[in-house]
A protein has these predicted regions:
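Intrinsically disordered, low-complexity, mixed-charge
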Residues: 1-90
Length: 90
């Protein structure tokens, strides 16, 4: 299992980014969470196989059709998750 923390920049709020990421994560078997941040970014903790995490990171670089992602920062993450949830804004 691999766990990564993503910080997604660009036009990523108000474009259904979080719900779209939850759907894609469920399709890939990725667990964790995604939330808006007050600074306008989206933050996500993703966990799964190397292949699944690589796939959700690739998706995160594009997001849903209305999004315009300019950068995705990636760090090692922590935690143990059973599902993928949309979390409250932080």
């Amino acid at each position: 299992m691999v766990t990564k923390l993503l910080l997604i920049h660009g036009r990523v709020q108000g474009v259904a980014y979080r719900d779209s990421m939850r759907i894609r994560a469920d399709e890939l078997g990725v667990t964790g969470w995604v939330r808006n941040r007050r600074d306008g970014t989206v933050e996500a903790m993703v966990q799964g196989t190397h292949e699944a995490v690589d796939a959700i990171i690739a998706w995160a670089n594009w997001g849903p059709p209305a999004a315009k992602v300019t950068k995705v920062e990636i760090e090692d993450g922590i935690g143990d998750f059973q599902s993928f949830d949309v979390a409250p804004t932080a």
